[in-house]
Amino acid sequence: NDNIKALNFNFSIQENDYKLDKILFKFNKINFNSEFLNIKQENNKYSVKGNLSNKKNKINNDLILLIFKNNFQNINFANSTFISNSEFTFDLNKKFKIKNLKISSQLNFDDLILKYESYKIKNFIKNYNNLISFKKSEINFKYSDEKFLIDGSSEYYIDKNYKDLIQFKIEKSKNKTKFETFLNLKNLEIIVRDIAYKKIKDDEATLQINGFTNNKKIFFNQINYKESDNKIELNDLEINNNKILNIDKINLDFLNVYNFKNQIDLIKNNNNYSLNGKSFDSTQLINNISNSESDNNFFEIFENFNSTIKVNIDEVKLDKNNIVNNFN
């Protein structure tokens, strides 16, 4: 039942100007209040301005379905609570059609559980069990006909006993969506088998991702991973349908599980690439190729790769016992 219950307010009228204040009501078992609601008649329209807030309440699925037209079956709201404070303005024509809607909201959520199955995450994060818990989430939300903006921060838990932090910002206008994400990864054990890299749990690490989407393509301006003296950075990466359309730079500077220091840069110059560096352990790459049951090669991750790569690496490790110097 979506009816408004227990409606109370103060009301005053002047010429073409309606003012309501101290509005209290209950909707879907949640108590809301509004300090003011102003309705002003101007020519052939009504201009509406007001605010709306609620104190700490439990989230119910009926409210989520009503607002988002989606019951988000992969999110568990059973123990979730939220606090909100919003301001809004809009115009209402004689046919009661809303125009020029603007909303500014501050939302606080607690105890959201996301069910997300991903073999890719499992490949990188040890003991990932398809659940991510979010607590103490603070979200700012702005909406207008031209732009949608959401930014915030939250604690997140892959292991229910250990928290990490996430910060994010998403801005959408027309067909373009910008995104910024910053993740603290201290309490995760991370394994990247293709480059023989491992991060131990409790070691400080961060991941920063900036980019945008446009016409189904994903552009990563920067992907920056840091853990102590280890660094992995990608610049200007463009992806479509899980294929790489372009990448301008890759920088690898890390100690791998075999205690070998990888220090190389892949840099695009016009349509070709140069691969330069002090040292690179190719053991894992060679093993992956030799043990593969597929005829696919590395370059099939690219869409129409048609470039030459000039290589100049001081030291390349081929296997446990063999190292090539001045590889070019």
Give the role of each language-model region:
Residues N1-N328:
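Membrane-proximal interfacial segments on either side of biological membranes
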